[in-house]
């Protein structure tokens, strides 16, 4: 019996890697085939049909109301229209929640490193308290102990004559739907793009000037802001933007909870920067704010972004807890449709595909950002 030669392809490292990946792929395919075959057999045994055609069937209306609907919807619409409402509601929470959580997390993270004893201790108490209590419990607190305890709409709390707060939600000023508003928005978008471009070119004065002229001024005077107003006929509040108590609860809960984890990520990233960088920047006469903005934070970003991506993904997945407080996101509406139609498998596939798509988009975006801020070794 002869031993295999060392130069055999079995000992080729490239072949071993490819062979291992092929084996793993085959195993995954076999697992999917096994469960798919079981699904088909069970559907046939129970004489059930599989398909998504019912979502678009106009003869089968959704027949249920959706309280928080940002787009036009009625119970006579199709199930697909109801799903679209849930999708928009989920996007509202995800986008605004990620933006607010990152902003609050950075502030709290910097507070954890503050030289002020009181600020540092308050930030520490916030992080340790929020991180060590369940998110669902926090949502119940915000909903049942805060928003539902607010006054009725007739006795709304009023702030500066422009903001109203009651147990049905929050009412805020909002731009009117007019040509002037859309023109101002277009100018603001161009101003933001120009400011980002100038900041990348290290032209700070031009960047601040473009922000002032093309963003701040149109924001204050260009947009036709409409403030909420109490209707004396029916005691309702008209105009402005209405954020329901369910939406506000979920947004606050997700923001506060996720920001606690982001704060620790930011703190760890900043502390990973060599202490000599601080001392060198201070020796050049830079103020602490400039040291953080120009020297420390850019070096901390490559450390911060990977775990920050995980926290953004967790926020997206945690948003499915909306069903616990009655907010109609994609998961809540899918559950209602599954109960009415018996299409539980199809709706589960829709929900899984939706969250998978959102998470893949976030992952790809954050990976691109991570490549941009990566420190290039010479």
Q: What is each of the regions a protein language model found here?
A:
Residues 1-378:
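Transmembrane alpha-helices and adjacent helix-loop boundaries
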């Amino acid at each position: 019996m002869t031993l295999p030669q060392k130069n055999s392809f079995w000992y080729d490292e490239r072949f071993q890697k490819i062979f291992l990946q092929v084996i793993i792929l085959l195993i995954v395919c076999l697992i999917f085939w096994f469960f798919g075959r079981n699904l088909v057999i069970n559907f046939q045994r129970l004489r059930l049909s599989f398909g998504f055609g019912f979502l678009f069937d106009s003869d089968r209306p959704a027949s249920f109301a959706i309280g928080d609907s940002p787009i036009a919807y009625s119970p006579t619409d199709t199930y697909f229209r109801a799903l679209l409402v849930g999708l928009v509601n989920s996007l509202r929470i995800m986008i605004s929640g990620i933006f607010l959580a990152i902003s609050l997390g950075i502030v709290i993270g910097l507070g954890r490193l503050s030289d002020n004893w009181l600020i540092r201790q308050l930030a520490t108490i916030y992080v340790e308290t929020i991180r060590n209590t369940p998110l669902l419990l926090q949502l119940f607190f915000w909903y049942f102990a805060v928003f539902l305890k607010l006054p009725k709409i007739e006795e709304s709390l009023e702030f500066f004559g422009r903001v109203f707060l009651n147990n049905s939600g929050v009412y805020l000023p909002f731009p009117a739907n007019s040509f002037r508003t859309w023109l101002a928005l277009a100018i603001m978008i161009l101003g933001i793009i120009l400011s980002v471009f100038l900041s990348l070119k290290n032209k700070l004065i031009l960047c601040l000037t473009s922000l002032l002229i093309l963003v701040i001024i149109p924001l204050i005077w260009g947009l036709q802001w409409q403030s909420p107003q109490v209707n004396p006929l029916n005691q309702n509040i008209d105009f402005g933007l209405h954020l329901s108590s369910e939406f506000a609860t979920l947004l606050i809960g997700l923001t506060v909870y996720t920001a606690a984890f982001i704060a620790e990520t930011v703190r760890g990233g900043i502390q990973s920067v060599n202490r000599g960088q601080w001392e060198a920047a201070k020796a050049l006469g830079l103020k602490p704010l400039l040291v953080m903005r120009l020297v420390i934070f850019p070096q901390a970003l490559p450390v911060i972004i990977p775990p920050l991506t995980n926290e953004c993904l967790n926020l997206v997945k945690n948003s499915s807890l909306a069903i616990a407080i009655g907010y109609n996101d994609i998961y809540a509406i899918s559950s209602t449709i599954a109960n009415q139609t018996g299409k539980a498998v199809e709706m589960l596939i829709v929900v899984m595909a939706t969250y998978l798509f959102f998470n893949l988009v976030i992952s790809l975006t954050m990976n691109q950002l991570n490549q941009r801020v990566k420190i290039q070794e010479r």
